[in-house]
Amino acid sequence: MSTSLAVVRLDRELPMPTRAHDGDAGVDLYSAENVELAPGQRALVSTGIAVAIPHGMVGLVHPRSGLAARVGLSIVNSPGTIDAGYRGEIKVSLINLDPQTPVVISRGDRIAQLLVQRVELPELVEVTSFDEAGLADTTRGDGGHGSSGGHASL
């Protein structure tokens, strides 16, 4: 089942978002500006596009794995969420996590990837307890934040 995504190129000199390989989940987003990020610095970077995410779907903006691994470039609010009703320009909140080296982003560089996925939109129902709602205790209960172990420091 194929879904189409309406894309407006706000900057006609930049290419449409592209998939590097047939079957890739994400499409690459391009920087619409030149930016230099000092170590630890963040910036909201324009992509020059706007999209119309279909109702019942969500756009998720993820870091590009090669940039994260090689130069420490990531996304502050990863993944960034694009709701179906948003029609403005996609901007990416990038951060340089390298402790020593600045990251230079040139206009036209691929800086992130956009995934579009179906999303459940549940009705929120207030309950006074999970037992009352028929959602009895689980083996995990309220354990979180390292409660399952898996690392020597935990």
From Swiss-Prot:
Keywords: Hydrolase, Magnesium, Metal-binding, Nucleotide metabolism. This enzyme is involved in nucleotide metabolism: it produces dUMP, the immediate precursor of thymidine nucleotides and it decreases the intracellular concentration of dUTP so that uracil cannot be incorporated into DNA. Pathway: Pyrimidine metabolism; dUMP biosynthesis; dUMP from dCTP (dUTP route): step 2/2. It comes from the Bacteria. Its cofactor is Mg(2+). Homotrimer. This is Deoxyuridine 5'-triphosphate nucleotidohydrolase. Residues 135-154 are annotated as: Disordered. Its EC number is 3.6.1.23. The keyword tRNA processing does not apply. Belongs to the dUTPase family. Each trimer binds three substrate molecules. The ligands are bound between subunits, and for each substrate molecule, residues from adjacent subunits contribute to the binding interactions.
